[in-house]
């Protein structure tokens, strides 16, 4: 189920279980995982498959493996706050994922996270090819970190 309110999302979480975050792109998905205490976000991996059924199966495997209690999906909103074509694509994906899992899903504004992730990797001297392979997972960890920081204030 997609939850629009962060406090409600937090209330539905199982204690001592991690969250995953997804940075959904047209060519790949970045995945990040929190620790059980919901205090640290770490890049996990990148899914380069574009077939939605295979993507959802991969996500279900990750959810089961790490015993995840909730999912955060980065929502790409225009800098002005307007909904874009990519926003609608991500919302549709979130709805499809919600049909496959019985976990709360929260959509988090993700403006500029992939660019920030790429810049961060660049500042560490990571080569372009490696940046392009990892920037979505790092962006997912930034999205997750934003939510974890907000949860601390609930």
Swiss-Prot record:
<keyword id="KW-0963">Cytoplasm</keyword>
<dbReference type="Pfam" id="PF03652">
    <property type="entry name" value="RuvX"/>
</dbReference>
<dbReference type="GO" id="GO:0005829">
    <property type="term" value="C:cytosol"/>
</dbReference>
<dbReference type="InterPro" id="IPR037027">
    <property type="entry name" value="YqgF/RNaseH-like_dom_sf"/>
</dbReference>
<comment type="function">
    <text>Could be a nuclease involved in processing of the 5'-end of pre-16S rRNA.</text>
</comment>
<dbReference type="InterPro" id="IPR005227">
    <property type="entry name" value="YqgF"/>
</dbReference>
<keyword id="KW-0378">Hydrolase</keyword>
<comment type="similarity">
    <text>Belongs to the YqgF nuclease family.</text>
</comment>
<dbReference type="InterPro" id="IPR006641">
    <property type="entry name" value="YqgF/RNaseH-like_dom"/>
</dbReference>
<dbReference type="GO" id="GO:0000967">
    <property type="term" value="P:rRNA 5'-end processing"/>
</dbReference>
<keyword id="KW-0690">Ribosome biogenesis</keyword>
<keyword id="KW-0540">Nuclease</keyword>
<dbReference type="GO" id="GO:0004518">
    <property type="term" value="F:nuclease activity"/>
</dbReference>
<dbReference type="InterPro" id="IPR012337">
    <property type="entry name" value="RNaseH-like_sf"/>
</dbReference>
<protein>
    <recommendedName>
        <fullName>Putative pre-16S rRNA nuclease</fullName>
        <ecNumber>3.1.-.-</ecNumber>
    </recommendedName>
</protein>
